[in-house]
Amino acid sequence: MKVLFGVCSWGLGHAVRDLPLLKRIIRRGYEVTVVGKGRSLDFIKKELGEKCIYCEIPDYLPPYSEKSFSVAKFVGRFPIYLREIAREHKKIKKLVESNGYQRIVSDSRFGIYYPGIPSYLIFHQLRFIAPGRVRIFERCTEGFNYLSLDNFNKILVPDLKQEDLCLSGDLSHNLHYFKESKVEYLGLLCDLKKMDMPEDIDYFISISGPEPQRTILEQKILPQLPLLKGKIVVALGKPEEEKEIFYHGARIYSYLDRKTQQEIMNRSRLIISRPGYTTLMELAILGKKALLIPTPGQTEQTYLASYHMRKGNFYSVSQEKLDLARDVVEAERYPGLKVNNIQPEDAEEKFMQVVFGG
């Protein structure tokens, strides 16, 4: 069977959560073509090498601004957003007609589908949530997603169905328009395993996200490293580079492969990172405490950070007000997410069952 798999390029998180699914598809013996761009595609290439075919097709800019959010800006960008989705779909249509795929899986790319071929969307943001919770805006965005996603056989949400245990909150729960038969809650996707080892790293700092905010966070954090006491490891989220340096006693990597990141996260007492959804799944599976720094302008991360701070799981601070020495003390007081007996392998198995029938 030939499978087309689209990966979103809005940071590395989508590529990271897709990795265990791609590995399962490959193990099944299917031929996989990965569509992506930039660092996300670079990451997949480094992890899977010649096991896949790769095709670079750019996706579209996210429908939010880089610095601040306003409903007017969001709505104003929608016509551009729709044109970009249509342009993406036109390229995908040519690719499908040239290669004859039997299944299509897309992570958060609305234009990667083909009529008549079973197409599935991995997506955890079925409604957009603006700061201040403008309810009519939220209903409109859910309605837009509902109509836009009708091209897919099912929406695969990488979250737990139980509202008291879920990670995404109102992003993908308490829905008004989506029918239960259309949405499949897979569980948590994470290729990292919890390991029994001493926590001999005090702080692991993961700097990530779309540019220019990734670089801005790097420039904000690195000068503050001397103010932290203990052993520090930093990952810069740049898979196109392979560098390792020491800076004010901290070990800094341009990029960590998944095996190394698994070990370092297991050894760390506190994780400092963006509240990207993939990161939250990793924190939950590993049972780690964290300091969360939302990417400015990304309403999803702002909501998730606020949601989990309100639930008493993690401490969060804005990028602008970040004071590492002060904020790590606050973050230590929060216990992290507890999802006992949740196995990522179950989510992978459910994905294979839904998409391939077993």
Segment roles from a protein language model:
Residues 77-80, 313-358:
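Leloir-type glycosyltransferase catalytic cores
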Residues 69-111:
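Conserved nucleotide-sugar donor-binding subdomain of glycosyltransferases
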Residues 7-19, 212-215:
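A short, glycine/small-residue-rich beta-strand->loop->alpha-helix junction that serves as a flexible
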Residues 261-303:
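A donor-sugar binding/catalytic signature common to diverse glycosyltransferases
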Residues 115-131:
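Active-site proximal beta-strand in glycosyltransferases
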Residues 2-9, 27-79, 251:
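Conserved nucleotide-sugar phosphate-binding/catalytic loop shared by glycosyltransferases and other
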Residues 130-212, 236-239:
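A nucleotide-sugar donor-handling region in carbohydrate enzymes
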Residues 22, 184-270:
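Donor-nucleotide binding loops and adjacent catalytic segments primarily
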